[in-house]
Amino acid sequence: MISLLRARLRQGRQTLDFPAGPVPLPERFRGRPVLDGSKCQEGCRACVAVCPTEAIRTDPLAIDLGACLFCAACQEACLTGAVSYTPDYRLATRVREDLVVSGAEAKLATALDDAMRSLLGRSLKLRQVSAGGCSGCEAELAALGNVVFDLGRFGIQFVASPRHADGIVITGPVTGHMELALRETYQAIPAPKIVIAVGACAISGGPFAGAASSGDGVPADIPVDLYVPGCPPHPLTLLDGLLRLTGRIRAGTR
């Protein structure tokens, strides 16, 4: 016991002061891309050619973050600097179309309506379903529970039973073998409920889009309340999206 107490005193406080404090990110972190179509050379489609998920289009230049793997192959292929990645981790949106980036403007997630926020704003229980994922997004979601991010201090927890949940977090491209399980889990969650799509696979199918054994993300008849792009998204991207959805981070404050 004494050794544990000494270690605790030596290590100090490890939990990030988020969202109020500074946000430490790795030097190589790739966040929101910034595009400048005026730098594009006429007829050049180098970035389009190297994108593994066809997330980029030209005329006008735009990137679909819902399909983007953040591999930065487009940035390396662009000789004029029209595409660059910033350390901005704020990527989550409420609307699928807002994930299409065509400049430097960021369209961030907004809060739930007053009625839903009064129910879920301070206590949100989520059931996670890995619908054919590679465990990348699942690992980042699990990291939210460690001492650094401490998701529980915001009243947000993952639960084992959909009957105890207020919403569902979906990862993976939704393979044929997982679609029924996903639908049954969604149906088992009491209304009103929310749906959160995490990662490129859940949003668009990611690199598996169009594959015979997988879908193109969350089925169209399941309404999504929050999209969190990335491959996988950083825990801070996930936390930022959840706090914006529940009204803990208000629009224009950060």
Identify the meaning behind each predicted range:
Residues S204, L242, G252:
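Long C-terminal interaction/binding lobes of large macromolecular proteins
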Residues M1-V50, E54-D59, E76, G81, ...:
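Non-ligating segments of multi-cofactor redox enzymes
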Residues K39-T53, A67-T80, R127-A142, A200-P207, ...:
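Local cysteine-cluster metal-coordination motifs and their immediate loop/turn environment
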Residues D59-C68:
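Short linker/helix segments within small regulatory modules
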Residues A139-L141, N146-F149, R153-L239:
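Cofactor-cradling patches in redox/metallo enzymes
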Residues L238-T246:
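Short amphipathic C-terminal alpha-helix that caps PH/PH-like domains
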Residues A111-Q157:
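Conserved small-residue-rich
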